[in-house]
Amino acid sequence: AYTGRGDLEHLDEALVAGLDAGMTVNEIKEILVQAYAYVGFPRSLLALQTFMTLLDERKAAGINDTIGKEATPVPDMDDTTKYALGKKNLAELSGVPADAPASGYAVFAPVIDKFLKEHLFADIFDRDILSWQARELATVSVITGVGGVEPMATAHMGICLHQGLPPDQLSALLNIIEINLGPEYTMPLRPVVE
């Protein structure tokens, strides 16, 4: 949530907590890289720089964090194949059939639908460092931290539920966000898990 909000001071503390809880360096990097798709390059890059500085400080203090596995390279594909993969991944992720008619922004600005399917749901979601459940939990956290994007946050919470995350796990995430950012960020989202 701190990445979405751009709160680097508190992000640093959350990164320490993640490492201390057993997350690997590569798992955290993957979350921060994926965040750019939801909050833009500036916040993602600043979060990555914050993480780099933290790792340097920990190393200097004699703390050796677990790097973790590297992502299996996503095969090179032409745009048509990549679009088809992204479309398939999105359908599996959301439960919305791949052949459902386009609507909303996908009709108004078809190029954004192309970018989402080829890049976010093929290039990023096909990487194997994080499960889809972990990616969606991270997405809910990041976009909730942005504030004012409740329709997106509730949609991603629905995807979490579709992916088999229990409502109490989403509720626990909202509790953590509420403790750290305040109830104004979480109250509009509570009906999804109640």
Where are the regions a protein language model picked out?
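Helix N-cap / loop-to-helix initiation motif
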Residues: 22-29, 131, 164-169
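Short runs of predominantly hydrophobic/aromatic residues within well-ordered alpha helices
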Residues: 11, 28-29, 44, 134-137, ...
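Short conserved catalytic/interaction loops centered on acidic-Pro-aromatic/His motifs
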Residues: 12-14, 150-158, 171
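Short, structured motif recognition centered on aromatic/hydrophobic residues
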Residues: 1-2, 15, 31-32, 134-144, ...
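Substrate/cofactor-recognition hotspot
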Residues: 30, 34, 39-42
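Acidic, glycine/proline-rich low-complexity segments that act as flexible tails and inter-domain linkers
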Residues: 3-20, 43-132, 162, 175-194
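Short alpha-helix boundary/capping elements
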Residues: 1-8, 23, 39-40, 142-149, ...
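Short amphipathic alpha-helix initiation/capping segments at coil-to-helix junctions
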Residues: 130-131, 146-153, 163-167
